[in-house]
Amino acid sequence: MTILKNIPKVDKVLGWEGLKSLLAAYPRPVVITAVRSSLEALRAEALRGETCAEAFAEKGVVGRIARELATVNALKLKRLVNGTGVVIHTNLGRSPLPESVRQALNEVAFGYSNLEFDLALGERGSRYSHVEGIICELTGAEAALVVNNNAAAVLLALSSLAAGKEVIVSRGELVEIGGSFRIPDVMRQSGAVLKEVGATNRTHPRDYSGAITPETALLLKVHCSNFAVVGFTAEVSAAELVELGRGHSLPVMADVGSGNLVELSGLLGCNEPTVQEFVRAGVDVITFSGDKLLGGPQAGIIVGKSSLLAPMKNHPLLRAVRIDKLTLAALEGTLRLYRDERRALKEIPTLRMLTASAADLSRTAKALLRRLQRAIPATVKLSLSAGFSQVGGGALPLLELPTTLIAVTADGMSAQDIETTLRGCPVPVIGRIFKGTFLLDPRTILNDDVPALIAALQTLAR
């Protein structure tokens, strides 16, 4: 095609005056790759008849290359605005950290630290000692250990306590926790032999006792936090399982999952057990997450009897799943807030969002609406409507949190157009579409998000 003759050669483009600033700003190999990519895209558009002569001029080509370089060199992991109303959104990074944790992270990240150095003795120390004390203080457990996530915590515990031996678990608790990641798979990987008992909806103490053999090493309870079985149901409580285990000299382990340290039943009207309840029930080993209801960084926390955690601390697998210094700093900073429950509810974003009342959210939504309306063109229309938020993170799946939503419409744009545009902004804004309307939930929009939200909404104006 004649139009293809207008596409400049790579060498010619590299010699253009307009490219000098890009060559000064980026490594030459990166610029060359962007030039080739841009010219190839231009060729494809020309073949589809989607371009004109001006696109081949120096100004147009250089502009395309500059945009390509900006995209290529932008950080892939970036901040965004969570307007979905899902508080512990796994795909959006789960729990945002408390502001007070920022200083702790800065100090540890940009300098040396006593990660594995005992300042009192002047010799090598343990990275796990920095948080073990406060975890035991908050939960009432004898000992604690932290790894990089809860799946790793379960894997380490099972590998240490039950490799090559039987682990008995209720059939109704063989959960999948997301991403096709299933408890039976973790058990097999640990070397433990899965022995399921009971029915999907009903399991009794006699089901466990009838399955115990000389090869049984552990009784396992898994908290079903991401689904609910209702109707004709029965389950064995942690206390009942502990009594059964002691009668057979078997340890009991519980995967609590969401890691709740605050009594939420009075605040949210739900029944989500706390880690402390499992400790008081006498459960020997308990595992839970750091970045769900606890509101901290991704981590797996193991608490329980000292005699059972001691071999985990010396297990070869611990090295593979150990926690890093930044996560330790963030976790310690978050846990310290729990020493004052009122402060924790106020300063830990996850807890603050979850416990915000409908009246508070109505006031927040109205104030945010006024602020947005003052800053965006009239072609972008905003309105309020009642709705519900979700907890997310595989916790409290049946709980609906009343909220006030902000509906967004724009002239000439469908809800899908709005979603795509906002998602493509420098600071992406993620909302949800319901019944053909794009919605933002103020519950999960942080104060610092508002300038970026305004800038994103301004791009909808036409």
From Swiss-Prot:
Its main location: cytoplasm. GO terms for cellular component: cytoplasm. The keyword Membrane does not apply. It is an enzyme of class 2 (transferase). GO terms for molecular function: L-seryl-tRNA(Sec) selenium transferase activity. The modification N6-(pyridoxal phosphate)lysine is found at K292. The keyword Cytoplasm applies. Keywords: Cytoplasm, Protein biosynthesis, Pyridoxal phosphate, Selenium, Transferase. Its EC number is 2.9.1.1. Its cofactor is pyridoxal 5'-phosphate. Pathway: Aminoacyl-tRNA biosynthesis; selenocysteinyl-tRNA(Sec) biosynthesis; selenocysteinyl-tRNA(Sec) from L-seryl-tRNA(Sec) (bacterial route): step 1/1. GO terms for biological process: conversion of seryl-tRNAsec to selenocys-tRNAsec; selenocysteine incorporation. It is found in: Cytoplasm. It catalyses: L-seryl-tRNA(Sec) + selenophosphate + H(+) = L-selenocysteinyl-tRNA(Sec) + phosphate. Coiled coil: none annotated. Gene3D superfamilies: 3.90.1150.180, Type I PLP-dependent aspartate aminotransferase-like (Major domain). InterPro entries: PyrdxlP-dep_Trfase (IPR015424), PyrdxlP-dep_Trfase_major (IPR015421), SelA-like (IPR018319), SelA_trans (IPR004534), SelA_trans_N_dom (IPR025862). Pfam families: Se-cys_synth_N, SelA. NCBIfam families: selA. Belongs to the SelA family. Converts seryl-tRNA(Sec) to selenocysteinyl-tRNA(Sec) required for selenoprotein biosynthesis. This is L-seryl-tRNA(Sec) selenium transferase.
